[in-house]
């Protein structure tokens, strides 16, 4: 079983550093182009993919749709377990606004955001269910930066600490009971095109 993990393409809020969380912001034109570049890469890749699944937020759904159409594979119904972390009061704020309102310890304050443990629990449940329901399939999952970061922490503890980039591609392989990264946070498809 392989799972390809993709962070959605760029949005206007990504450009200005606003936390999106569950706010349903669409891709911008650059984000759509990024998704097409990744789809082109996946069409030429050594792996074959059977399904694409995404969260229910439009930035992930549109990214997933572009990829599924290009690869001619089914797009599964959205799964709410892979939605971005809820950031509560922090959603829609820039770094400067967060610092002004709550100081540099805003992450430690109770501002209504979902905890790391809650995000990790639903991430691991999703992986478990996918490995049981689709044990002989290779699945592409389009999700969100904070969700993916927490998934990697749940699986690999502190080994992977890079910022998860828009349209980054990670491949995890499950052998026996263990997940191993074959590729991590790769954006080669964007760098080759300077997007």
Please describe what each predicted stretch is.
Residues 2, 7-73:
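Active-site-proximal alpha-helix that buttresses catalytic centers in soluble enzyme cores
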Residues 3, 137-146:
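Generic beta-sheet signal
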Residues 11, 147-148:
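Short active-site segment of divalent metal-dependent hydrolases/proteases
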Residues 38-44, 73, 78, 84-96, ...:
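Acidic, low-complexity terminal tails and accessory targeting/binding regions
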Residues 45-48, 130-137:
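Glycine-rich phosphate-binding loop signature in dinucleotide/nucleotide-binding domains
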Residues 54-55, 121, 142-143:
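Short beta-strand scaffold positions
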Residues 99-118:
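Short glycine/proline- and acidic residue-enriched helix-loop micro-motifs
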């Amino acid at each position: 079983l392989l799972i390809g993990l993709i962070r959605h393409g760029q949005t206007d809020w990504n450009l200005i550093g606003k936390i999106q969380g569950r706010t349903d912001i669409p891709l911008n034109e650059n984000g759509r182009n990024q998704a097409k570049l990744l789809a082109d890469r996946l069409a030429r890749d050594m792996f074959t993919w059977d399904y694409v699944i995404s969260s229910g937020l439009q930035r992930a759904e549109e990214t997933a749709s572009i990829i599924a159409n290009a690869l001619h594979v089914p797009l599964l119904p959205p799964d709410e377990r892979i939605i971005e972390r809820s950031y509560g009061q922090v959603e829609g704020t820039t770094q400067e606004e967060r610092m002004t309102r709550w100081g540099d310890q805003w992450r430690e304050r109770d501002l209504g955001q979902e905890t790391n443990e809650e995000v990790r629990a639903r991430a691991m449940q999703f992986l478990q269910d996918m490995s049981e329901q689709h044990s002989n399939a290779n699945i592409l999952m389009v999700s969100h930066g904070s969700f993916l970061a927490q998934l990697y922490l749940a699986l690999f503890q502190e080994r992977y600490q890079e910022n998860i980039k828009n349209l980054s591609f990670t491949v995890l392989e499950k052998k026996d009971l263990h997940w191993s990264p074959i590729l991590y946070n790769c954006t080669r498809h964007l760098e080759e095109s300077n997007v």
